[in-house]
From Swiss-Prot:
Name of the protein in question: Electrin-1
Organism: Litoria rubella (Desert tree frog)
Methionine amide carried by residues: 6
Keyword RNA-binding: no
Subcellular locations according to the entry: Secreted
Gene Ontology biological process: defense response
UniProt keywords, alphabetically: Amidation, Amphibian defense peptide, Secreted
Length: 6
């Protein structure tokens, strides 16, 4: 999972 801010 990759956070939106990354």
């Amino acid at each position: 999972f990759v956070p939106i801010w990354m």
